């Protein structure tokens, strides 16, 4: 039986929506969850829901790591925080994975400190799904864990991202590219050019350099895009901001006339489908690849759907033994 630890205390809006998502995962997906946080508060919220009590446990954690806390200090001094407690019950194999919508740096630091790295992994990256016009999402690796990278880090990111795309998104032969300032082989900086030479020697479906427009299905077809965490995090936040801006502009435009409002009513099912396709909550969170346990990091604003989706991904990663695949391929490719 696979259990997933859920940090219910660290989100922006309190524990109720996170607990709702966890209960939905139990009721709709058959998941088993350990809710990590203040036991009394969790118990009171659970009274609002119906669920199989054999599939929900509570792990008491009296402390909370704030978004403004120093990650490296917090994970050592706040040992009874929900982030640290969730990590530790993955480390002791009580749970196969964890999800936290809290301080990203603290979640990463806790995972590195208590779970450690998979043998052979140089630097664990964050793998973030980017919704596409059609089909499964594109995977952005690294989306913020490592702001400074060496070429061999990027080569490992390519391998880990390819495995994730195969196992979780069911893409048979994922196309892998390096994010660059042009698609020509000689475009890029010193690190990306050296990484290009390393990755093209690997037995993966490498399509070379890709440009920013390729991330959204408007150019070269690509499933995994590799970059350092500095660029990746900017891309991720810009993508999220642009998506919200487009829908806000559309909403305001509809308000301008009765004709537009009538048209919007006719298009409501289509607009709803588009919004669902572009909603990050459909994918739950970003996986911290390369740590010796499944660790998903969510938005502070994660809603119930995002939590449910993250729990589903955690279980799928464990079922597919993604970490064993990563260790085996890195060893086989000698990188």
Curated annotation (Swiss-Prot):
Q: Does the keyword Cytoplasm apply?
A: yes
Subcellular location field: Cytoplasm
Listed under GO biological process in this entry are: fatty acid biosynthetic process; phospholipid biosynthetic process
**The keyword Phosphoprotein belongs to this UniProt entry's keyword annotation:** no
Residues that span the membrane, as ranges: none
List the signal peptide residues: none
Keywords from UniProt, A to Z, are:
Cytoplasm, Lipid biosynthesis, Lipid metabolism, Phospholipid biosynthesis, Phospholipid metabolism, Transferase
Q: What is its EC number?
A: 2.3.1.274
Q: Name one GO cellular component term.
A: cytoplasm
**GO MF annotation, one:** phosphate:acyl-[acyl carrier protein] acyltransferase activity
Q: Which reaction does it catalyse?
A: a fatty acyl-[ACP] + phosphate = an acyl phosphate + holo-[ACP]
Q: In which pathway does it act?
A: Lipid metabolism; phospholipid metabolism
Tell me how this protein assembles.
Homodimer. Probably interacts with PlsY.
Q: Which protein family is named in the record?
A: Belongs to the PlsX family.
Protein function: Catalyzes the reversible formation of acyl-phosphate (acyl-PO(4)) from acyl-[acyl-carrier-protein] (acyl-ACP). This enzyme utilizes acyl-ACP as fatty acyl donor, but not acyl-CoA.
Protein name per the record: Phosphate acyltransferase
């Amino acid at each position: 039986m696979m259990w997933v630890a859920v940090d219910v205390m660290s989100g922006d809006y309190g524990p109720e929506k996170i607990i709702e998502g966890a209960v939905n995962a139990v009721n709709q997906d058959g998941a088993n969850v350990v809710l990590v946080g203040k036991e009394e508060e969790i118990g009171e919220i659970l009274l609002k829901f119906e669920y199989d009590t054999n599939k929900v446990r509570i792990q008491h954690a009296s402390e909370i790591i704030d978004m403004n806390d120093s990650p490296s200090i917090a994970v050592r001094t706040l040992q009874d925080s929900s982030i640290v407690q969730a990590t530790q019950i993955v480390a002791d194999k009580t749970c196969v994975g964890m999800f936290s919508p809290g301080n990203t740096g603290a979640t990463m630091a806790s995972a590195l400190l208590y779970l450690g790295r998979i043998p052979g992994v140089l630097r664990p990256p964050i793998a973030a799904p980017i919704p596409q016009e059609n089909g499964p999402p594109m995977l952005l690796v690294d989306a913020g864990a490592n702001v400074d990278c060496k070429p061999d880090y990027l080569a490992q990111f390519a391998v880990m991202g390819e495995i994730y795309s195969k196992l979780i998104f069911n893409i048979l032969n994922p196309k892998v590219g390096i994010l660059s300032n042009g698609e020509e082989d000689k475009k890029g900086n010193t690190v990306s050019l050296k990484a290009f030479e390393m990755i093209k020697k690997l037995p993966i479906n490498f399509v070379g350099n890709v440009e920013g427009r390729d991330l959204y299905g408007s150019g070269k077809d690509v499933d995994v895009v590799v970059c350092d965490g500095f660029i990746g995090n900017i891309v991720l936040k810009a993508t999220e901001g642009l998506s919200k801006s487009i829908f806000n502009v559309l909403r305001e435009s509809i308000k301008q006339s009765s004709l537009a409002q009538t048209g919007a009513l006719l298009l409501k099912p289509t607009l709803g489908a588009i919004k669902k396709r572009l909603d990050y909550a459909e994918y739950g969170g970003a996986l911290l690849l390369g740590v010796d346990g499944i660790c998903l990091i969510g938005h502070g604003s994660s809603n119930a759907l995002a939590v449910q989706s993250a729990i589903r991904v955690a279980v799928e990663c464990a079922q597919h033994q993604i970490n064993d695949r990563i260790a085996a391929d890195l060893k086989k490719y000698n990188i």
